[in-house]
UniProtKB/Swiss-Prot annotation:
Protein name: AA9 family lytic polysaccharide monooxygenase cel61A
Keywords: Carbohydrate metabolism, Cellulose degradation, Copper, Disulfide bond, Glycoprotein, Metal-binding, Monooxygenase, Oxidoreductase, Polysaccharide degradation, Secreted, Signal
Record bears the keyword Secreted: yes
UniProt record similarity statement: Belongs to the polysaccharide monooxygenase AA9 family.
Region (Disordered): 262-310
EC number: 1.14.99.56
Comp. bias intervals (Low complexity): 275-310
Amino acid sequence: MIQKLSNLLVTALAVATGVVGHGHINDIVINGVWYQAYDPTTFPYESNPPIVVGWTAADLDNGFVSPDAYQNPDIICHKNATNAKGHASVKAGDTILFQWVPVPWPHPGPIVDYLANCNGDCETVDKTTLEFFKIDGVGLLSGGDPGTWASDVLISNNNTWVVKIPDNLAPGNYVLRHEIIALHSAGQANGAQNYPQCFNIAVSGSGSLQPSGVLGTDLYHATDPGVLINIYTSPLNYIIPGPTVVSGLPTSVAQGSSAATATASATVPGGGSGPTSRTTTTARTTQASSRPSSTPPATTSAPAGGPTQTLYGQCGGSGYSGPTRCAPPATCSTLNPYYAQCLN
């Protein structure tokens, strides 16, 4: 009991002091073709950032959307998100791989994916009118306290997640909404952390599936049992928040990372671009994106004493086997027995 109370106290302290876990999707891969996503840590500071398939967002710190904003448009595609100016073309039945950075993803929780038909160009659609239907959702896989989660599968595949576009989806322009919900602090009100990411895709095919959807601001409520929950208990029964997966669709597909073999730029309505073949490709590494490259990745020197973790990365906790030292000026702060984080 004393240990559980201690867990709750440190979790509350983490929430009160604004401790966050950070990440965004750096790129997506469709049938071996690499597309750049929106980078909130660099694009806002560029005079002419590239047109990409990912929606822009004002999460300059790789931060999250909290439950008190669930009825705010920020929950739809992240903070102050605006439409991506381009899209990627996919066929119904294709798989799309998301690459999260930085690695490893530090927090336990579910992973969910949604689609919303734009009924026109997604580049100009009003996000508050989008009606999302869930095409997959994976939560607690086994155990408890905290157990094995969808996020652990993502970590084991180098921070990647694969989603399948339904085989029988009606053709059209869609916003694909991918999301991790971090639950390490969810035992306290407003403690869950949502990381929604949106992408424009143009789906081709001959299917007829057109599920009804839910407005983004109606997907979740702060008191949903899958949002307000202490995961540091066992046994644990977890209910993934939001609408159920569309009837007849699998809750997930086989997961695994793979190297891209070509690159492509986002297609702009009225224009076009295509894959650029590459003669050399590299497999994913734990600190690099999935983009093909013919040159070795840049390296940076680390303080003496072995590898270090980046700011806001995990540096300790039960079952953790990565770096336990933080790159200066950050220090490793223990939040609970299961998680320690590099903080300033």
